[in-house]
């Protein structure tokens, strides 16, 4: 009997890359126009004032300003960007 295992016997050894979702800029932080605020699956957080949404639900800033997380109603949240005076 062989004292070493044959080549190619393992069926493991695969792993997918992380998708790097989540909040990229937090409340109170300043942001430039076009910068990503949140990467998400579905509208966990909705776009508010001066925030756009990409086809993959990514939220991004439309203006330079400060990020603010707010309530839309009891269940839903939104993120807005307000210009600094």
UniProtKB/Swiss-Prot annotation:
Q: Tell me a GO cellular component.
A: ribonucleoprotein complex
Q: What keywords sit in the KW lines?
A: Ribonucleoprotein, Ribosomal protein
What is this organism's lineage? Bacteria, Pseudomonadati, Thermodesulfobacteriota, Syntrophia, Syntrophales
Q: Which InterPro entries does the protein's record reference?
A: Ribosomal_bL27
Q: Which domain of life is it from?
A: Bacteria
Q: So what family is this one in? A: Belongs to the bacterial ribosomal protein bL27 family.
Q: Which GO terms describe its biological process?
A: translation
Q: Does the keyword Ribonucleoprotein apply?
A: yes
HAMAP family per the record? Ribosomal_bL27
Q: Which GO terms describe its molecular function?
A: structural constituent of ribosome
**Family matches, as Pfam families:** Ribosomal_L27 (PF01016)
What NCBIfam families does the entry give?
A: L27
Q: Where is this region: Disordered?
A: 1-24
Q: What is this protein called?
A: Large ribosomal subunit protein bL27
């Amino acid at each position: 009997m062989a004292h070493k295992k044959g080549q190619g016997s393992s069926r493991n050894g695969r792993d997918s890359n992380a998708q790097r979702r989540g909040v990229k800029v937090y409340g109170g932080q300043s942001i430039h126009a076009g910068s990503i605020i949140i990467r998400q699956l579905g509208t966990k957080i909705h776009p508010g004032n001066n925030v756009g949404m990409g086809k993959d639900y990514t939220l991004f800033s439309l203006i330079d300003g400060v990020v603010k997380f707010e309530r839309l109603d009891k269940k839903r949240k939104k993120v807005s960007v307000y210009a600094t005076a």
